[in-house]
UniProtKB/Swiss-Prot annotation:
Its biological purpose: May play a key role in the regulation of the intracellular concentration of adenosylhomocysteine.
The EC number(s) this enzyme carries: 3.13.2.1
Record family assignment: Belongs to the adenosylhomocysteinase family.
Keywords per UniProt: Cytoplasm, Hydrolase, NAD, One-carbon metabolism
Record protein name field: Adenosylhomocysteinase
Gene: ahcY
GO terms under cellular component: cytosol
Pathway stated in the Swiss-Prot or TrEMBL entry: Amino-acid biosynthesis; L-homocysteine biosynthesis; L-homocysteine from S-adenosyl-L-homocysteine: step 1/1
Record: residues binding NAD(+): 198-200, 232, 261-266, 284, 319, 340-342, 385
Length: 472
């Protein structure tokens, strides 16, 4: 891997700075499709609410993320950035942001060792300063500081890695502690809070909070309605098949496609596949989600039942070993297997290590079993839409990232209102604000309640219009 570091600046690592011009042109296009972020820039640029914020960002380094980064900077923040996935970086986006002077450490196809090196670098600020905010996706940046601080007190927490990724992470922490025995606790003490982007990271935060281990306040961005019901659903509805088709050129129509998990992400995936006239089967553990899938006309089965019959498999659960080695051994020759959940362990990729691997092209592999049968594994079990394509469209990411920006402002400027160790969601009026910022772009014209109508249903004329417990 030929990473590029500018010797005069030496505070970024990207694949090729010559790609910066291309990245800048795509950023300009993305800005026209991200009205929420651009409106927030206009609203807050003068007041600079993030002045003094030093944000350590760990989120897919895409063009859309570039617009987020430049919005945070426009509002006064200083930012250091790494990707939260080894395959999700768009190298031209990383170069374009690095060219502006914002430190970026991200390369598409980086190794696990490089991944954790780069995640450490977002906490290595010059002149003895430290990050005071985290913007996270999947929770790795948050995990790094907490686990490292625990290891300072008890190195045995690093004794038994449960996966290759943990082995690399634990080694990186040990190496860092060898240089500075207080590296993690020093930085952890400076953090005011974290805003977390995705389901998996939010799950981690709630676990840490319940155990009394979370060292700062957190805002759960994922469960804002304008994130989970848009990014997770509509974003995946477009980006899943983009990734599958770029990787394989497969004809989806007529195929049997299995979607594991029928949450918001799984719903979007199922809608996309059925729109291309696949026969969609769903696997579920939750009776409510299973009933929803059945009522939409999908066949709900077990993975054991589906394995031998389907042509395309998509995991969307956020769980562990949803597709096992045994399942894959039962699959058809040339079955396509991919994941759209955050981590790579939804598919038991580690269980395939003793199979023969044949790279077809980057992020597309034949896995050949002893009997000669092959499956096509996409993105090595990591996010297919970002590993094999470019992720969600700009418009839907504007909604997600508007939530992230507002959450950063909330947590930084009103930190005393958020209790250390607790996880919060943004209030309803801010969720509705994010939605409003995107209506004009789609030509939407809202109706307005009269005072009498508002009184009749017991809401303010200007909203919020739904109670917090309302399920959209």
């Amino acid at each position: 891997m030929n990473a590029v570091t500018d010797k005069s600046v030496a505070d970024y690592i990207v694949a090729d700075m010559a790609l910066a011009g291309w990245g800048r042109r795509e950023l300009a296009i993305a800005e026209t499709e991200m009205p929420g972020l651009m409106a927030i820039r206009d609203e807050y640029a003068a007041s600079q609410p993030l002045k003094g914020a030093r944000i350590a960002g760990s989120l897919h380094m895409t063009i859309q993320t570039g617009v987020l980064i430049e919005t945070l900077v426009a509002l006064g923040a200083e930012v250091r950035w790494a990707s939260c996935n080894i395959f999700s970086t768009q190298d031209h986006a990383a170069a374009a942001i690095a060219a502006t002077g914002t430190p970026v450490f991200a390369i598409k196809g980086e190794t696990l060792e490089e991944y954790w090196q780069y995640t450490h670098k977002i906490f290595e600020w010059p002149e003895g300063r430290h990050a005071n905010m985290i913007l996270d996706d999947g929770g790795d940046a948050t995990l790094l500081l907490h686990l490292g601080a625990r290891a300072e007190q008890d190195i045995s927490v690093l004794a038994k890695p449960g996966s290759e990724e943990e082995r690399v992470l634990f080694a990186a922490i040990k190496e860092t502690l060898g240089r500075d025995p207080k590296w993690y606790s020093t930085r952890l003490a400076q953090i005011k809070g974290v805003t977390e982007e995705t389901t998996t990271g939010v799950h981690r935060l709630y676990q840490m909070s319940q155990k009394g281990e979370l060292a700062f306040a957190a805002i759960n961005v994922n469960d804002s309605v304008t994130k989970s019901k848009f990014d997770n659903l509509y974003g995946c509805r477009e980006s899943l098949v983009d990734g599958i088709k770029r990787a394989t050129d497969v004809m989806v129509a007529g195929k049997i496609a299995v979607v594991a998990g029928y949450g918001d992400v799984g719903k979007g995936c199922a809608q996309a596949l059925v729109a291309l006239r696949a026969q969609v089967w769903v696997t579920e553990i939750d009776p409510i989600c299973a009933l929803q899938a059945a009522m939409e006309g999908f066949k709900v089965v077990t993975m054991e039942e589906a394995a031998a019959h389907a042509d395309i498999f998509v995991t969307a659960t956020g769980n562990y070993h949803v597709i096992t080695r045994q399942h894959m051994e039962a699959m058809k020759d040339q079955a396509i297997v991919c994941n759209i959940g955050h981590f790579d362990n939804e598919i038991d990729v580690a269980g395939l290590e003793n199979c023969q691997w044949e790279e077809i092209k980057p992020q597309v592999d034949h896995v050949i079993f002893p009997d000669g049968k092959r499956i096509i594994l996409l993105a090595k079990g990591r996010l297919v839409n970002l590993g094999c394509a470019t992720g969600h469209p700009s418009f839907v990411m504007s909604s997600s990232f508007a939530n992230q920006t507002i959450a950063q402002i909330e947590l930084f400027t009103r930190n005393e209102a958020y209790t250390t160790g607790q996880v919060y969601v943004l209030p309803k009026h801010l969720d509705e604000k994010v939605a409003r910022l995107h209506l004009k772009k789609l030509g939407v014209k809202l109706s307005t309640l009269s005072k009498q109508q508002a009184d009749y249903i017991g809401v303010p004329v200007e909203g919020p219009f739904k109670p917090d417990h309302y399920r959209y």
